Swiss-Prot record:
SUPFAM superfamilies: dsRNA-binding domain-like, RNase III domain-like. This is Ribonuclease 3. The keyword Magnesium applies. It is found in: Cytoplasm. One of its GO terms (biological process) is regulation of gene expression. Digests double-stranded RNA. Involved in the processing of primary rRNA transcript to yield the immediate precursors to the large and small rRNAs (23S and 16S). Processes some mRNAs, and tRNAs when they are encoded in the rRNA operon. Processes pre-crRNA and tracrRNA of type II CRISPR loci if present in the organism. The lineage of its organism: Bacteria, Pseudomonadati, Pseudomonadota, Alphaproteobacteria, Hyphomicrobiales. It catalyses: Endonucleolytic cleavage to 5'-phosphomonoester.
Length: 239
């Protein structure tokens, strides 16, 4: 990550090309890229921008999904919305833009790995959206969001994540409940067991999965509900 207090002219032009907007107030871009740990930077850090950007992103994605999936239920739209505004998706956008080359952080943050570093990348994307909103208005922010999210929104697999996570979000949105997993049977020898797990969602029919581990069986059961309810397209139909 860069250690310079502000972007060089070359870096600014490169990043603005990736964003699709030339900032009127150049310091807004610097602000959006500055983590709180980079305390020497006078423009402030991106924490307040992140708060605003999260709301702008949610609005634009909700509108995109509403217009794109005309027959989807509120619960189905909520699941897709949660996928598309997740830290994982925002971090993927950051990686696509190579934002790690421009983010300013303190020495401690530079050492972060895994989920914590993923969150930093995701936060910067949200702060960048806020900076665009402040610099050019909602249409400028929406143009950027569509540039990087529209393709993700219409992927056949709905930008699949963990099946249990997806099912929980759908169950909360549609029924206001949490899925319940039950181990019905464990069979086979210790070196090659088989777990039979049923998942129940109040308001929907249960499904069962059989796998070599309890977690894998839970995933299979969750996937079957998601595919049955049309939240996920069956894998066989995607080929």
């Amino acid at each position: 990550m860069t250690k310079t207090p502000t972007l060089s002219q070359a870096d600014r032009l490169t990043l603005e090309a990736a964003i699709g907007h030339a900032f009127v107030e150049k310091e807004r871009l610097d602000w959006a890229l500055t983590h709180a740990s980079a305390r020497t930077h006078k423009a402030g850090n991106y924490e307040r921008l992140e708060f605003l950007g999260d709301r702008v992103l949610g609005l634009c994605i909700a509108e995109l999904l509403f217009r794109t999936f005309g027959t989807a239920t509120e619960g189905e739209l909520s699941v897709r919305l949660n996928q598309l505004v997740s830290a994982e998706t925002c971090a993927a956008v950051a990686d696509e833009m190579q934002l790690h080359l421009f983010i300013r952080t303190g020495a401690d943050v530079k050492k972060l790995t895994g989920k914590r570093m993923l969150n930093v990348r995701a936060d910067v994307v949200e702060s960048l959206i806020a900076a665009l909103y402040l610099d050019g208005g909602l249409e400028v922010a929406r143009k950027f969001i569509l540039r990087y999210w529209e393709g993700r929104a219409v992927r056949p697999d709905g930008a699949r994540r963990d099946a249990k996570t997806e099912l929980q979000e759908w169950a909360h949105a549609k029924f206001g409940v949490t899925p319940v997993y039950r181990v019905d049977d464990r069979s086979g020898p210790d070196h090659d067991p088989r777990f039979t797990v049923t998942v129940e969602v109040a308001g929907a029919a249960p499904e069962t999965g059989i796998e070599r581990s309890k977690r894998a069986a839970e995933q299979v059961a969750a996937t079957r509900i998601l595919e049955r309810e049309g939240i996920w397209q069956p894998q066989s139909a995607q080929k």
